[in-house]
Regions:
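N-terminal "first-domain core" detector
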Residues: 1-43
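Hydrophobic residues embedded in beta-strands of well-ordered beta-sheets
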Residues: 44-47, 56
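A short, exposed loop/beta-hairpin motif centered on an aromatic-Gly-Thr core
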Residues: 53-63
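Amphipathic alpha-helical interaction segments
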Residues: 58, 75-83
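A short, charged, amphipathic alpha-helix used as a generic interaction element across diverse proteins
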Residues: 63-76
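Intrinsically disordered, low-complexity, charge-dense segments enriched in Lys/Arg
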Residues: 83-171
Length: 171
């Protein structure tokens, strides 16, 4: 098992490759209790922990340093990617299209295997929640219907008739 100091060195080296600032990286051996992740290690495993206001929100456990590093950078690159997608959003396009693409690019810069893994994780998400490029159009139309006095139920029905949800995935 690597020590916390050795893990921190590896994380900082990887963070530098993608320009990730220190304040979005985990802490090591202690929690700020602000939902900023921290890393723990003992003789048995590595732990990636999120705690807030005295409550542990999540704990990921692994004995594999590569798995720990992937978990850290899946979170870091997700935040980067969402910010990138918001700044470069294409009108009437599901923002996840750009965010997912950017995250895979960043993960691939860190490790080609991580890029592949991220791509497959996105594919699983999209099986349950396909891209919805009409979401913003539907919302604007719904609001205009409500402003015209239509009930919530009727505005929903009309908005979904004009801009239907994507088809449910098969299987």
């Amino acid at each position: 098992m690597l020590t916390l100091s050795e893990i921190e060195v590896k994380v900082n080296e990887l963070a530098q490759k993608i320009g990730a600032p220190q304040n979005i990286l985990p802490t090591y051996g202690y929690s700020e209790q602000t939902a900023r992740p921290h890393v723990e290690v003992d003789s048995w495993a590595y732990y990636y922990v999120v705690a807030q206001s005295g409550q542990e929100v999540s704990r990921y456990t692994t004995r594999d340093i590569d798995q720990l590093l992937y978990k850290i950078f899946a979170d870091v690159t997700f935040g980067f990617s969402v910010r990138y997608a918001e700044e470069n959003h294409i009108e009437n396009e599901d923002i996840r299209r750009l965010a997912f693409q950017r995250q895979v690019e960043l993960l691939t810069l860190l490790s080609p295997q991580w890029g592949v893994r991220g791509f497959h994780e996105h594919a699983q998400i999209l099986k349950q929640a396909p891209f919805d490029d009409d979401g913003s159009l539907r919302a604007v139309y719904w609001k205009s219907l409500r402003d015209q006095g239509y009930s919530v139920a009727r505005a929903n029905q009309m908005a979904h008739e004009k801009y239907p949800y994507p088809k449910e995935p098969k299987g």
